[in-house]
Amino acid sequence: MFHEVILNVLKNPFIALFLTLSLGYLVGKIKYKTFVLGGISGSLIIGVIIGQLNITISPDIGSLFFALFIYAGGYQGGAQFFRSLNKDTLLLLASSTITCVLGLLCVLVFAWIFQLDKGTAAGLGAGGLTQSAMIGSANNAIAMINSVSESTIHTMQTNVTVGYAVCYIFGSFGPIILLATIFPLVMKWDLRKEAIKLATEQSDGNLDLEVGQFSAFSEYTTRAYKINRDSQLLGKSLVEVYKTYKYKVVIKNIIRDNKLLTITPETTINTNDIVAITFYADLDIQSIISKDIEVTKPEQFNFIEEKRSLILTNKNLFNKTIKEVKDIIQDRNYYGVFLQKIIRSGQKLPISDDLKLRRGDEIRLIGKPEDLDKISNKIGTFISEAPITDFIFFGLGMVLGYIFGLISFNIFGISITLGAGVDCLLSGLIFGWIRSIKPQFSNLPVGASNFIRDLGLAIFVASVGITAGPQAITTIKEHGLTLFFLGIGVTIIPQVISFYISYYLLKIKNPIVLLATIAGGRSVNPGFAALLERAGNATPVIPFTSSYALANIWLTLWGPVIVALVTIIPK
């Protein structure tokens, strides 16, 4: 009875999914030396096992969570993707084409050696290369054969489905192991370190820090000094200090006679004052306070600073240099703020006095809230730093993604669609790019996008395993292991050859770029998910997107090509 209760509980698709998720990531922690199975591989294995209970998972569940996963991944890489479209992208497309062509040749060679019929060969290609669209294109090509009976056409179309089912499991699982474990192990790559390194290069040297890490160096520092009678600061007002040292030194607080003063721009500095000075870390502060004595921070110095981002909308500041802007907005008042960075179209600009500002530039300032309040309305629109999701644009992004999925076009009479992956991926890229150039719109905080991405891929892989589990065992029993092992060959051989061609001949040397390109050329979503998990950031998105889009077209076209070139027809 207890056994029946457990079975009935597991029949609930949501219980099965989340149990697969939990056990899969538990199994994924298995480690042997440098080999780590990983949560994605673990979820696929556990899903196949739990799938033996014939649990029905609606395909819409997997599709929805995959759409969420791929949208979040695209969003995170959107800004960098559109900036990276250059001649180097041609190498990625060449690698993708090589992978696809090698896959086709592998299928044709196996079909010739093992005397496979048109349908089985097409199924071998669809499953081993994990391209379900190939089923449709192959079936359409088979239906157009006029020289055979309808029953033979039906048999060949059935063989397409059977071949796909037999080969699909390893077609999904194999790239996970190859891309996320075997290749990095052979090449002695640490994917997380390589991803951080690549992200740093793409962000002009800004470190991609892991949770718990922080930079040991700060752009600004605050120290306390006691003013001597021969100090350079003695007798100066706070606004004079600010302007004398070109806005690089700010007096934040003053203690006089053991009392914290309420300071104004006109407040002057007296002998024996204890002042809190904030200054740029690269400033030679000793040349300014050489006559003064540094002291430990008094208890009265407990002021709070804030970082604030503004979009330049004040037309009086358009096309003005930074020096001119400083002179304009600091003309009569002491504000005590620092310019931290300027971002234009998603890219950080080097700050110099002669840099001209443009409408829509994002200006990031640092200072006390009351000082920032004074200056903000003279620059433009405030952008909230709160980690709040803009559900207006998130909803529009998903809608646009599904609309993209409805688009189809014909190549040589074959209907091609963007597919379940490219649609929301493309939408995510667009809305991530919008966020980079218009930061007041389309906010999806890093924490939220990471959660959507990770949960989406985990549920997607779990549903794939549960759904494919029963059919995989059944078809292997019915059709033997030959087709299964041929599928392994179709999955592994093109990837291995393409990997070395891309690395040594095409000179794609960056590990993350190379592995993501191979994943895209194989049109393998679980493999990309595993790579994304190991990378820990969005660096694989850009190369994957380029090669994935082209591979979808090539692999869909291979269906009719296989049907045309394989000559055997079942009796």
Swiss-Prot record:
Gene3D superfamilies: Regulator of K+ conductance, C-terminal domain. The chain crosses the membrane at residues 5-27, 34-56, 61-79, 92-114, 161-183, 391-408, 412-434, 455-474, 484-506, 513-532, 547-569. PANTHER family: K(+)_H(+) ANTIPORTER SUBUNIT KHTT, PTHR30445:SF9. GO terms for cellular component: plasma membrane. NCBIfam families: Asp_Ala_antiprt (TIGR03802). This is Uncharacterized transporter FTT_0829c. One of its GO terms (molecular function) is monoatomic cation transmembrane transporter activity. GO terms for biological process: potassium ion transport. The keyword Nuclease does not apply. It is found in: Cell membrane. It is a multi-pass membrane protein. Keywords: Cell membrane, Membrane, Transmembrane, Transmembrane helix, Transport. The keyword Nucleus does not apply.
